[in-house]
Amino acid sequence: MKNSIISYPRIGANRELKFAIEKYFKNQSSKEELLKSAKDLRIRHWQEIQKAGIDFIPSNDFSLYDNVLDAAVLFNIVHTKYKNLNLDALDEYFAQSRGYQGENGDVTALAMKKWFNTNYHYLVPECDNADIIALTGDKIFKEYLEAKELGIESKPVLIGIFTLFKLIAFKDEKTQKLAKEKLLNAYIELFDKLNELKVTWLELDEPYLVYDLSKEDIALFEEFYQELLNHKKDLKILLQSYFGDLRDIYPKLLESKFDALGLDFIEGKQSLALVQQYGFAKDKILFGGLINGKNIYANDYAKSLKLIKELQKYTQNIILNTSCSLLHVPYSTEFESKLDSSYLKLFAFAKEKLQELKDLKEILNSSEENPLFRANQELFKNIPERLDEKVKARLKALKKEDFTRTPSFKERALIQKEFLKLPLLPTTTIGSFPQSADVRSNRLAFKQEKISAQNYTEFNQQKIKECIQIQEEIGLDVLVHGEFERNDMVEYFGENLKGFLFTQNGWVQSYGTRCVKPPVIWGDVSRTKPITLAWSKFAQSLSQKIVKGMLTGPVTILNWSFPREDISLKESTEQIALAIRDEVLDLENAGIKIIQIDEAALREKLPLRKSDWHSEYLDWAIPAFNLVHSGVKAKTQIHTHMCYSEFSDILKEIDAMDADVISFEASRSNLSLLDTLKAIRFKTEVGPGVYDIHSPRVPSVEELSLTIEKILNKLPKEQIWINPDCGLKTRAYEEVITSLKNLVTATQKIREQL
């Protein structure tokens, strides 16, 4: 029995990659220094994986920003607007990631989307000229040879042709048609080069196969691979899937020329049933994904061994594998000195998952009962308490009316118009303002008990004063307090709710250099005291204008945390919803007129198969949001915000959230959402996001005016809010102030024309 992993986290044990890239962005280091830091990290990771006894060690899973972009660049799928900048390869790569504004031109970044049902974001490759598609990059070969120099025969990992093709945004059908042919030739050339290098295994990741596949999808997949696999020669090909099962294509794969199939037995609800029904091919190896690549709880070896035993009825050719890339979990528990060992022993981050694979291999390769198995089973005895009877009783007492807000949206809109007295096209921001180094050091000093609570509060109050003053000077209509007390929109609430645990160093890559530290939902969740009330009251006391209360919604808190596995996601979310509901009512009682409840991650856990959308997610996720705000008065305006996602197909469900105003992150997707909003007569007021805050570009008044006009061409003016597309925490103040001034100027200009 051998073992494997799909991919390893690339940010480093202490986010070394993030800091190295940011240094380069700030012109504080050279290209050579950045590339050396990246190479050092790769070497460290390979040696770590090798030391852990992993047989199939991945290469080309490393990325300076995003692995989808890496695949696109490898095959020269680069939009002309980036080519025309005439930058060197590295800066052209980063121009696609972040946009570019300088002497060579002014271009926006590629659109960003959620990577399937995870909190990782990938960049959407754009193709306007298929003629140039060819194997022009060498990253995959270089990194294979780097590993080879260390004595490691690695397994290069690359996004498969079918998934890559499905993720590309093509200019038109003609471009797409030509791209199909050119991309196939480029992959064939890739196979030839890997054969020249005498590479043994190539892993092609095809996660798109876990969606509902149409007949056309299956035909396209077969068209690609029937040709491609004829060119594999001595190269062995592993078709790797994750985030679900292969029910639409599994029987066909058994008859294909792939040398191995990677199946996900964690999220693939039907993976085992498919093997039981159709068996497994004698000429193939099964890479069995049984170590959870998405959650941080320790593997129960008894369950894994039971699964392997069942699979061995159908094939003896099994490689132990992770369910998906380990990119989605933190690096290692060895950096967690503050978490009680009674909890920590039950966690396995990326490095610990390597150990689990090593243990399982050893247990399966030994004849008598192994002490490693006994030690693992001991972990699950004497688990710390998770239950809270008060929370259970409160959930049990919920009635149907607790999930419905009255009066109707139409009636509320009239009441709020009279009560709030806002101008046409009201301007606002999404919530957070830039967090400078002094804000972060003040928070750290307070956490480390180096300053008093009073000093900490006074510092933040001063920051709030400055933030309110800046917004008033700019001329925004609805203000925010800036969120200087918050490290992260989910972690902050988790820290103030009972039932959560926190890591010191549990960083996970969200996109590019952005890393998040998800909390762990350990037990039943409740609110023991107000969380944001004092900050919101203080901010509102500083201005005659409305200052929004800012909260994170229950579905986002759940989706951006590591969830419990002992109760349903529905129950966990309802517990969080009741806690946030208490906060909403406190804010309203304190005179806060607009309360924003962000559901940035609503789309995130939507099942990948449409048939499961309602029964497994939306039927409880939407009511959980309703539970949070159903108790407020008609005059209180409820806002929500949603991040990078595709919403077109769930807009009716979003409307059913019954918020009064919804802001979307739509600027990177060229506001394509507007047509759908118009088509379904979306009733909620909307702020589609008029510029992209994930890029350092400052939009001009002209650019913003055109965007606002574009929105007005699609939606009634009474329905529109003007705002950036996300919070401003990661930007610099000079960018923010100029951008917001331009936003207000553009809005005033448009108002005069209406």
Curated annotation (Swiss-Prot):
It catalyses: 5-methyltetrahydropteroyltri-L-glutamate + L-homocysteine = tetrahydropteroyltri-L-glutamate + L-methionine. Pfam families: Meth_synt_1, Meth_synt_2. Signal peptide: none annotated. The active site is at H694 (proton donor). InterPro entries: Cbl-indep_Met_Synth_N, Cobalamin-indep_Met_synthase, Met_Synth_C/arc, UROD/MetE-like_sf. Keywords: Amino-acid biosynthesis, Metal-binding, Methionine biosynthesis, Methyltransferase, Repeat, Transferase, Zinc. Binds 1 zinc ion per subunit. L-homocysteine binds at I430, G431, S432, E483, D598. Its EC number is 2.1.1.14. It comes from the Bacteria. Its cofactor is Zn(2+). Pathway: Amino-acid biosynthesis; L-methionine biosynthesis via de novo pathway; L-methionine from L-homocysteine (MetE route): step 1/1. 5-methyltetrahydropteroyltri-L-glutamate binds at R15, E16, L17, K18, K114, R514, C515, W560, E604. It is an enzyme of class 2 (transferase). One of its GO terms (biological process) is methionine biosynthetic process. The keyword Isomerase does not apply. Coiled coil: none annotated. L-methionine binds at I430, G431, S432, E483, D598. Belongs to the vitamin-B12 independent methionine synthase family. Catalyzes the transfer of a methyl group from 5-methyltetrahydrofolate to homocysteine resulting in methionine formation. This is 5-methyltetrahydropteroyltriglutamate--homocysteine methyltransferase. It comes from Campylobacter jejuni subsp. jejuni serotype O:2 (strain ATCC 700819 / NCTC 11168). The lineage of its organism: Bacteria, Pseudomonadati, Campylobacterota, Epsilonproteobacteria, Campylobacterales.
